[in-house]
Amino acid sequence: MTSNLAIARGALDNIPPVALACSRWLIVFLIFFPFVYQTIQKKRKDFKNEFWKLFFLSATGYAGCGALPYVSGLTTTVTNMSIIYALSPIFIVLLSAYIYKERLKYLQYCAVLLSLFGVSFIIFKGNLNNFLNLNFSIGDVWIFGAAICWSLFSIFLINWKSKFNIIERFTLMSLLGSLILIPFFLIEHFLFL
């Protein structure tokens, strides 16, 4: 993901953020589709049965987590993006506990706090002044949204079983992610550029 955050800041001078995310997933779909076409054809009924789960996973993990870091990169720093996105594992633990009504054990709370401290220590290089001098922007809200999307995607990807193997599922979610992003691409293209 770190390289993705750097791309979010670097490539945006040439390619708008939603266009970048949409084309990225469309290219992935086009590369993988020839290899899974026949098996997906045979599993059309499974696709129909799993459509909303695949749609949710595509919306969170592919569209949301694919586009929001790029949108964020327009108005925030890679450092801020890294700090906020590094909170994803903590969000996964907390959201999973909330969604599945599980009580966190004492050691899990300790692990969350320890990882939060560790991430903060590394990013701020152990210097409190680095933390105090942070400036936040709207881009930080977008990357926070991406971290939440990634967390939800991770939780449900593990817990939702599928009739599709990993490559078939990846290909279908790449297509759905692209399709979800197309309206936002059109808005970006015609209203903002």
Show the residue positions of the predicted features:
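Juxtamembrane C-cap of transmembrane helices in multi-pass membrane transport proteins
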Residues: 3-15, 27, 66-76, 84, ...
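C-terminal transmembrane-helix exit sites in multi-pass transporters
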Residues: 31-40, 88-113, 117
